[in-house]
Amino acid sequence: LGNFYMRRILRIWPLYFAVIIFAFVAYPLAKSFIGIKGEGFANIMYHMVFLSNFDLIHMKQTNIDAIPTSQAINWSVSIEEQFYLFWPLIFAFLPKKMWLFSILSVIAISILFRMQNYENKDILYFHTLSVLLDLGIGGLFAFLVTQKKQAEEFFKNISTRTHCLFFVLFFGLIFYNQELFDFKYGLAIGRVFISFSIALIITAQAMTTSNTFLNLKNFKLGTYWGKYTYSIYLLHPICLTFSDVCSRVFNIPMVNFINTFIWGVLAIVLTFIVSKISYDYYESYFIRLKHKFSILK
């Protein structure tokens, strides 16, 4: 159990805390140095202990909109760390026959909490108990493919048609979300179906051995950049902010499509470059230490 936590720490914490240092220290100092005044409303202590999602809820519900994206982006990582703090305990201390019941209980509790707060969009989107639904459904699929042979075989031998069906289901739920869930508890329970469709796609992509063009492992570019996704997620607000500052410094107006398009492309390219540098020369040092805490004997 200790090795699991250490491996998690070595992968997540180094970049997470580097972003916090930038967002709460370096960025405000840089703004002050060039004469830009700005008040930071986020509470750094919430971020330090992985409770930033609650800080974000507080700011949104007190109508504080000027939240730097480099500070706000941490909320989902906080929820993941909260989740992974207790999730391994289920499998470490409960008998195997209780695992499925525990996973289903987490999902049920999250759905009930979402229904209780069906009118509060901030709670539905950022509260830990609301988002546990996604992680619980992911855990359910992981349980099924590792503990149930039929589920494992189904996803391993999945056909192109079924792959396509999963994508159609997902995009249909996304595009027709408002129409499909336009009822009292729709906002609360609509997430169940969307999360389920995402879990189907992820599990199929992770498990499939079928030779199908919808097996995204065949897309080498996407596979290559897959290891950089955590870096891209946390660093893209910083790169967007830098690009925005540059456009202001050089008086580049964002009033036409061409300028906006060029700015967007440059921001994306910068994000990929910075993310690769971060992973190759910073994060990888800690990742290489993970072998000392192997969870497989």
Model-derived features: where do they sit?
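Structural preference for long, well-ordered alpha-helical segments in enzyme cores
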Residues: 4-8, 18-22, 82-90, 242, ...
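Membrane-interface helix-loop-helix regions
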Residues: 13, 20-77, 110-121, 196-202
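Membrane-interfacial loop-to-helix junctions in multi-pass inner-membrane proteins
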Residues: 1-17, 33-42, 85-86, 154-157, ...
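Hydrophobic alpha-helical transmembrane segments of multipass membrane transporters and ion channels
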Residues: 10, 14-18, 22, 231-235
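Alpha-helical transmembrane segments in multi-pass integral membrane proteins
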Residues: 1-3, 25, 29, 55-66, ...
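Small-polar-interrupted transmembrane alpha-helices in polytopic inner-membrane proteins
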Residues: 19, 98-116, 163-174
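Hydrophobic transmembrane-helix microenvironments that flank and shape a buried ionizable site
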Residues: 5-11, 44, 49-50, 73-79, ...
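Hydrophobic alpha-helical segments with transmembrane-like composition
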Residues: 12, 56-109, 113, 129-132, ...
